[in-house]
Swiss-Prot record:
Organism superkingdom: Bacteria
Keywords from the UniProt entry: Cell cycle, Cell division, Chaperone, Cytoplasm, Isomerase, Rotamase
Gene: tig
Family indicated by similarity: Belongs to the FKBP-type PPIase family. Tig subfamily.
Stated role: Involved in protein export. Acts as a chaperone by maintaining the newly synthesized protein in an open conformation. Functions as a peptidyl-prolyl cis-trans isomerase.
Species assigned in the record: Levilactobacillus brevis (strain ATCC 367 / BCRC 12310 / CIP 105137 / JCM 1170 / LMG 11437 / NCIMB 947 / NCTC 947) (Lactobacillus brevis)
Enzymatic reactions: [protein]-peptidylproline (omega=180) = [protein]-peptidylproline (omega=0)
Name of the protein described by the UniProt record: Trigger factor
Length: 436
């Protein structure tokens, strides 16, 4: 009997399939070899009992469950391939029949990917993107570089102003008691940077080096340390130094300091314009891509996403995020302590976008099928080369880590994204256009 698939409600169905007698025999043989190793039968050394004696004493049926566990994975994989379905979680498998010398018949309750009915996905209307670089953009970028080149110079007997940097000792108290993280010595703080609790920096403006200041603040309601939220605190602050920024002149020498490949401020501005143009073009492409794909997803009819797919997506996002933290030397436990969050908080954060991510992928897969996108071997080889270069790996290592099917799937999805984005028409105006 060929595998038989019967679709039910809620993305589930019943898959009925058989395990052939020759495969059953292989499973029984392996099951017996495992079982007899620890079997002690009077008259035989441990692990040496003949198969015939075992069958007489216990019956061959005693091996059925172990044999089924051995042969089921291969039989199930073959059945889902024959039925042309894509399960999204582990099936619930029940035995229909296990008759001697007959195929074993099994029935699995399987959850599959939701059905997708594509709507319009080519030639979609998207917002027109402005990639023009204005002089104000160039000036702002040059000013940012100027700020980065600034030197901090001591202010002698002058009061601190916004934009100045103060070097301070501080010691915080809540209800007259010190608290963790509330004390530091020789701390450099730029006034106006808003890196401290609201109100802290403002109260240091107007004070000079050598002065002691009592700073009174209230911790925000969303402060990361829950025990300090909405609490009033007093920080005893000693100002050791007040420094102001000394900005370099906007001239050719400044340009050379910023970029050794230019000889003048004019050249720096031209190079900055080119770089900003490239950034705007990239940002515009990304915006068009995001809007077009989002519209294609909205246009599609998609059945409810199974819980198993949502859980799998959230797990994958969390694992990837925490792995990135570990690469930066931050273990998960330390991350949750530093952020004042829990694993459940992080799960909720990723849960918010899980359904959208899954539906997007489902639509892209449907586009791949509709457009009959089939990556070539040359495209696979190019993808392997790119990944090897990106991650500093040998190409052979990439091929070992990723199967051809995985590589072809990723390439096909990228092609579907390009098809949707490249065919989009920029004919929607932004709410407020820049007329400069």
């Amino acid at each position: 009997m060929a595998a038989k698939w019967e679709k039910k409600d809620n993305n589930q169905g019943e898959l009925t399939f058989e395990i052939a007698p020759d495969k059953i025999k292989e499973g029984l043989d392996k099951a017996f070899q495992r079982t007899k190793k620890n079997l002690a039968v009077p008259g035989f050394r441990k692990g040496r009992v003949p198969r015939q004696i075992f069958n007489q004493m216990y019956g061959e049926e005693a091996l059925y469950q172990d044999a089924l566990n051995i042969v089921l994975p291969e039989a199930y994989d073959a059945a889902i391939k024959e039925a042309g379905i894509e399960p999204v979680d582990q099936p619930q498998v029940d035995v229909e029949s296990m008759d001697k010398d007959q195929p074993w018949v099994l029935k699995a309750v399987v959850t599959v990917k939701p059905d997708v009915k594509l709507g319009e996905y080519k030639g979609l209307s998207v917002t027109k993107q402005n990639t023009r670089v204005y002089q104000k953009d160039i000036d702002a970028e040059i000013e940012k570089q100027r700020q980065q080149q600034a030197e901090l110079v001591l202010k002698e007997d002058e009061a601190a102003a916004k934009g100045d940097t103060v070097v301070i000792d501080f010691d915080g108290y809540v209800d007259g008691k010190q608290f963790d993280g509330g004390k530091a010595d020789n701390y450099s703080l730029e006034l106006g940077s808003n890196s401290f609790i609201p109100g802290f920096e403002d109260q240091l403006v107007g004070h000079k080096a050598g002065e002691d200041v009592d700073v009174k603040v209230t911790f925000p309601a969303d402060y990361q340390a829950e025990d300090l939220r909405d609490k009033e605190a007093t920080f005893k602050v000693t100002i050791h130094e007040v420094k102001e920024k000394q900005l370099p002149e906007l001239d050719d020498e400044f340009a050379k300091d910023v970029d050794e490949d230019v000889d003048s401020l004019e050249e720096l501005e031209a190079k900055t314009k080119d770089r900003l143009k490239e950034q705007k073009v990239t940002a515009a492409h990304d915006a068009i891509e995001d809007e077009a794909i989002s519209e294609a997803v909205d246009n599609a009819e998609i059945a409810a996403v199974p819980e198993a797919m949502l859980k799998d997506d959230i797990d994958r996002q969390m694992d990837q995020y925490l792995a990135n933290m570990q690469q930066q030397g931050i273990e998960p436990k330390m991350y949750f302590q530093l952020t004042g969050t829990t694993e459940d908080d992080l799960r909720k954060q990723f849960a918010d976008g899980a359904e959208k991510r899954i539906k997007t992928n489902l639509v892209l897969e449907a586009v791949v099928e509709a457009e009959k996108i089939e990556p070539s071997e040359d495209e696979v080889a190019a993808e392997v080369k790119d990944l090897a270069s990106q991650y500093g790996m040998e190409e052979s290592a990439v091929r070992s880590a990723l199967s051809d099917d995985m590589l072809k799937h990723d390439i096909a999805i990228k092609s579907a994204v390009d098809l949707i984005a490249d065919s989009a028409k920029q004919d929607k105006k932004k709410d407020a256009e820049d007329d400069e």
